[in-house]
Amino acid sequence: MSTDKTYCGFIAIVGRPNVGKSTLLNKLLGQKISITSRKAQTTRHRIVGIHTEGPYQAIYVDTPGLHMEEKRAINRLMNKAASSSIGDVELVIFVVEGTRWTPDDEMVLNKLRDGKAPVILAVNKVDNVQEKADLLPHLQFLANQMNFLDIVPISAETGMNVDTIAGIVRKHLPEAIHHFPEDYITDRSQRFMASEIIREKLMRFLGAELPYSVTVEIERFVTNERGGYDINGLILVEREGQKKMVIGNKGAKIKTIGIEARKDMQEMFEAPVHLELWVKVKSGWADDERALRSLGYVDDL
């Protein structure tokens, strides 16, 4: 019987919207799992990413950005998901952006002060700071906010110092059996990952034109006789005008979204994919908690 020790633990990645949490997770895992886009609030579910290296297994919880506005049902549920992630982990990575400090950062910090888990502060996008002389005083300001386990300036985009974060994580994993097989990257279903890929392309190609009132349901996900997948995706928007926006002139926009989403799916699933997309108006879904539950927004709370 093998007596080799193994180490395993949960790590929450927290921070206000759009500071680079998903990009950091993807870099830590070495591949794209969490949806990344320049728009705030693109992560809506607690995606678990798993990184196994030898005896070490780090299980990352990628939270929605904690933010102060809680007006709509979807925002309330996103905040609840983020707060619940903080409560049951061995370690927290708190991501902030360059020399910016906002009331939202302060709110996240206050939640962390109440927690028991040690906190690594990841100061992201330091490569984008114009006035380098401002960086050191800002790092000192951050160091005075709470007793951080470590403060690491990083660039999640380029990967700078991400290995330092990974090293600190490994050191703090408790001795435990691995929760997942070593080839697992995420515990989310392929159906869920397909919907996230489509949603990322919507964010990417529609940019600021489309509000957050868009979601994706996978209505069909089956293996075909060619050894690939037939996937039907339903894009839900709140208004007729948004539907036209998603479809684009003579269907050009939805065609581009479909082509790019299919490429990513084929890479992730390592199999040919036949993807069909439809757009449907379902008004008020972002305000209706029952509708959100039916779309899986609270399946993990």
UniProtKB/Swiss-Prot annotation:
Residues 62-65 are annotated as: G3. Residues 206-283 form the KH type-2 domain. The keyword Cell inner membrane applies. Keywords: Cell inner membrane, Cell membrane, Cytoplasm, GTP-binding, Membrane, Nucleotide-binding, Ribosome biogenesis, RNA-binding, rRNA-binding. GO terms for biological process: ribosomal small subunit assembly. GTP binds at residues 15-22, 62-66, 124-127. Residues 7-175 form the Era-type G domain. Residues 15-22 are annotated as: G1. Residues 154-156 are annotated as: G5. Transmembrane segments: none annotated. Residues 41-45 are annotated as: G2. PANTHER family: GTPASE ERA, GTPASE ERA, MITOCHONDRIAL. An essential GTPase that binds both GDP and GTP, with rapid nucleotide exchange. Plays a role in 16S rRNA processing and 30S ribosomal subunit biogenesis and possibly also in cell cycle regulation and energy metabolism. This is GTPase Era. It comes from Salmonella paratyphi B (strain ATCC BAA-1250 / SPB7). The gene is era.
